[in-house]
Amino acid sequence: MPVRQLPETIVNRIAAGEVVERPASVVKELVENAIDAGASRIDIFSDGGGRRKIVIADDGSGMTRADLALAVDRHATSKLDDEDLLQIRTLGFRGEALPSIGAVARLTITTRHAGEPHAWTLGVEGGDKSPIAPAALSQGTRVEVADLFFATPARLKFLKTDRTEAEAIRDVVRRLAMARPDIAFTLAGEERAPVTWAAALPGAPGQLIRLGDILGADFRANAIEVRSEREGVAVEGFAASPALTRANALGQYLFVNGRPVRDKLILGAVRAAYSDYLPRDRHPVVALFVTLESREVDANVHPAKTEVRFRNAGLVRALIVHALKEGLAREGRRTAANSAGSVISTFRPASMPAANWDWRASPSYPVGGSAIDAPSFAERPQAAFDVGGPSADIRTHEVAPDLLDRPLGAARTQIHETYIVSQTRDGLIVVDQHAAHERIVYERLKASLAANGVQRQILLIPDIVEMDEATVERLVARADELAQFGLVVESFGPGAVAVRETPSLLGKTDAASLLRDLAEHMAEWDEALPLERRLMHVAATMACHGSVRAGRVLKPEEMNALLREMEATPNSGQCNHGRPTYVELTLTDIEKLFGRR
């Protein structure tokens, strides 16, 4: 077959395959055009998952009659003044969106420029243009796309259900709305109630309002502002505290120069920053905005412009990690306050037993000769409560007054051998002793590793731990990494490991249990996992085994010592798994519980 030039309509349909992948791609391109046109309000409507109809209306600058005629030609754009593709400051710039959409759908554009006496309209159907005609429109541009992919029926077979495509459209609009809180957005159609996001004030407060409207009240309540800047690169936005996580990474919204992107470099930086706070199967919720010179980033990597390439990727990654870690460390106490708020919101007053309730039928009624049946109690019947009489003499251990002024207060008691209750000047704090000590041990291990290494204790008699051969090989292969944390192991035959030294920080530990947990975690590691991340996983596992367990009775001085250690430990508001280590209730919170406020 001889080589021949393809017709323009076929060329446009081929190009449309790169730009218009699904209805959500159409919405993205058209909304970006509206943003570039300076719109302050954008209305989006879709029907049938975008297959039947998509309508985008804005109040932007609009187009003149001459511009409208060129807008549907390939590679015609108003967004590039010269040949320098490295100085792109607009979201769309290729000049392919409108002709590509018109090549595979029925496209109608109605627009009015401020300098025109009236609006103009133009139709494109399967690549064939209709003449431009006068129309009625007060301001801006209205683009209607009907029967998407009617000209390429094979593409319809690859679309998902209407519901799935509608959700993809919703996700695109949400991301664009997050990037521009100064623009009002309305999303309607799909037999749903319209959703409107009003324009917010500029700056971080307005940005947080928009993010809260889209991501929910939980994100707004847990949001931590992050900011970092160096060498012309700025990172800002909001990150949720470790108390708010998800089972996947879909809650991570990333923007580069106002453009929503899905960048592996940024996602990896987010994971690294949260590695000390979350378990491996949980993901943070963040909205990060990276701003840098246009020359420092290539947005022309993919036709859909969802991928970017940084000139100095290392600097961008380091800034993101630094901004997130600094924000998380600064707001370490937020988790406790937020947890207390959730406790209050779900609290329901206890129901009192009926007046004729027989307490002897209660499971808590002592059986046999208990202290309550002793003569000393029987001979002295209980007196009625005397309002004017003195209070009961409840003796507790003495607490130094200055301890009440410490951030975590003075320990008062331990309940269920698991939780420490401490008193502060304006409330009380409940501490999970295991979670708190786990964070303390973890931070100590990290500090020791960064200094001169973790101190070891030699076992007089090595612990021999029996395991299957594959597990033994896995542990022995990582023996050098384990030794950095003071855990010295070696093979002891085909099915056993000898533990010769353990970290001093862990004290007396169950070596068999620790090794089995380490082996399970190592089995899940990707070979490409950086050494630093592997070491932090080892430290987290050791900290869990080396911390005080629930069920251990603590003396008052031990409880206070733990509180003081928490105050001196970074990130002590959460354990290594992202759970809160303590909950703080102010007097105001307590009064709300009892209906005093």
From Swiss-Prot:
It holds the Pfam family MutL_C. Keywords: DNA damage, DNA repair. The keyword Cell cycle does not apply. InterPro entries: DNA_mismatch_repair_CS (IPR014762), DNA_mismatch_repair_MutL (IPR020667), DNA_mismatch_S5_2-like (IPR013507), HATPase_C_sf (IPR036890), MutL/Mlh/PMS (IPR002099), MutL/Mlh/Pms-like (IPR038973), MutL_C (IPR014790), MutL_C_dimsub (IPR042120). It comes from the Bacteria. GO terms for biological process: mismatch repair. NCBIfam families: mutl (TIGR00585), PRK00095.2-4 (NF000953). This protein is involved in the repair of mismatches in DNA. It is required for dam-dependent methyl-directed DNA mismatch repair. May act as a 'molecular matchmaker', a protein that promotes the formation of a stable complex between two or more DNA-binding proteins in an ATP-dependent manner without itself being part of a final effector complex. This is DNA mismatch repair protein MutL.
